[in-house]
Amino acid sequence: MKRIGLITLIAAICLALGMMVNPTPVVAKTTFVTIGTGGITGVYYPTGGAIARIVNQKRKVYGIRCTVESTGGSVFNVNAVMSGDLEFGVVQSDRQYQAINGLAEWEEKGPQKDLRAVFTIHPEAITLVAADDAGIKTIADLKGKRVNIGNPGSGQRQNSIDALEVNGINYETDLVAEGVKAAEAPGLLQDGRIDAFFYTVGHPSGAIKEATAGRRKVHFVDIPNIDQLTKKFPYYAKAFVPIKFYEGATNKEDVETFGVKATLVTSAKVPDKVVYAVTKEVFDNYEEFKKLHPAYEVLTKENMLEGMSAPIHPGAMKYYKETGLDKYLK
């Protein structure tokens, strides 16, 4: 009995010592979040990458792992965020306005009441690129031409239609409208399969550089009657295409057009702590963020709070109130 008791005592001591020396590690649960962007040659994709890079630097602090997905663009991103397939999406400011108000693609579904704004990013110019040999000097010259206006469901498609209609051009009857993704248009233009294309994009853009660097010479076309557009649609503003980024274009001066802003949206169902972390890391590392793409050169903390139509997510609002940035919200 004594022998058995001694063995039991030794076993108990060993077990206790083992627990003290090798405690079971507590592993923090990682929350995976995905940002929906756009084509890989546009600015949305690197924008999502820039946000993810900043946030992932503190992944051990927040327990958040951020990834990026190339998507069909704004409309897809809104719908994917609303369905829970994405936690965040980069969306044109006009599409944010339309979604929260139940307009355009959301007319049948109605207002997307759970859509929430986080912040805005770079300005995006509605850019019209035409081949020099296609005889297109003005937007009126697009009549009878083969023009890519953007894939169905993309923000740029509606921008293209608005630009055409304000100038008296019906995209269904006055031209041969193609509906391919913006990233494919430069190749089609260089191959001679289209005469021109619209692209709503921040500058500089890899896709636009591709279009202007080919053997077929191209130029940018002014879009007139912008005052009528901005009066009718509150989310549009005057903009320009900066020629300095595109040495291959045959233009000599910047080109007038109109534009929107890229915005980051999420859902009301995404936890406050996740949205707070994303907001805090981007704004706390604002100077580093600005260096991640030339399109961010014009950013200020103040103008990153302009152009939002949906309610601000509580997680983002918490950060803005903590830092006093909420005074810039309109």
Where are these regions (language model features)?
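Bilobed "Venus flytrap"/periplasmic-binding protein-like clamshell domains
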Residues: 32-58, 120, 124-191, 306, ...
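An extracytoplasmic/periplasmic, membrane-proximal ligand-sensing/linker region
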Residues: 184, 191, 201-225, 231-232, ...
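Boundary at the C-terminal end of the N-terminal hydrophobic targeting segment
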Residues: 26-30
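Pocket-lining segment of extracytoplasmic ligand-binding domains
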Residues: 93-95, 104-105, 134, 171-264, ...
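C-terminal segment of classical bacterial N-terminal signal peptides
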Residues: 15-25
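Pocket-flanking alpha-helical
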Residues: 52-53, 67-109, 128, 183-188, ...
